[in-house]
Amino acid sequence: MIHGIGTDIVYIPRVSRILQKYGEKFLNRIYTEKEIELSRKYNSQEMRARYFAKRFAAKEAFVKARGSGQGIIMKDIEIYNDVRGKPYLTVSKDFISKIHLSLSDDGDYATAFVVICV
């Protein structure tokens, strides 16, 4: 049974500008240490911005699917890829529901779609 759905779209050049202006301060506020560490495999600023934009969209989409951001911060939500490259989302707070995640990017935009099932 579907509990909620959420979607978000992020303008990648905006994330790139934020990274240039605020750097680690921005990253440490939104992303987990592991997400930041995994981003280091990308050598170019453009690829890192794309990586973080998709994860930001996923976090926002999850909050929308949940119906509220109360009691949860962005760092409670982590986005990874399995060995086949499929994205998945974990939540550090007690959250038992099954979460489905789809990420995409094209040109200047990154999108995420989340379905929460109970």
From Swiss-Prot:
Pfam families xrefs: ACPS (PF01648)
A GO MF term: holo-[acyl-carrier-protein] synthase activity
UniProt cross-references to SUPFAM superfamilies, sorted A to Z: 4'-phosphopantetheinyl transferase (SSF56214)
Catalytic activity entry: apo-[ACP] + CoA = holo-[ACP] + adenosine 3',5'-bisphosphate + H(+)
Keyword annotations from UniProtKB, A to Z: Cytoplasm, Fatty acid biosynthesis, Fatty acid metabolism, Lipid biosynthesis, Lipid metabolism, Magnesium, Metal-binding, Transferase
Entry binding sites for Mg(2+): D8, E60
Cofactor(s) needed: Mg(2+)
GO annotation terms (biological process): fatty acid biosynthetic process
Keyword Lipid metabolism: yes
Chief location category: cytoplasm
E.C. designation(s): 2.7.8.7
EC top class named in words: transferase
Subcellular location: Cytoplasm
Gene Ontology CC entries for this record: cytoplasm
Entry-linked InterPro entries: 4-PPantetheinyl_Trfase_dom (IPR008278), 4-PPantetheinyl_Trfase_dom_sf (IPR037143), ACPS (IPR002582), Ppantetheine-prot_Trfase_dom (IPR004568)
HAMAP family documented for this protein: AcpS
Protein family according to the UniProt entry: Belongs to the P-Pant transferase superfamily. AcpS family.
Purpose: Transfers the 4'-phosphopantetheine moiety from coenzyme A to a Ser of acyl-carrier-protein.
Protein name, UniProt field: Holo-[acyl-carrier-protein] synthase
Species, as recorded: Wolbachia sp. subsp. Drosophila simulans (strain wRi)
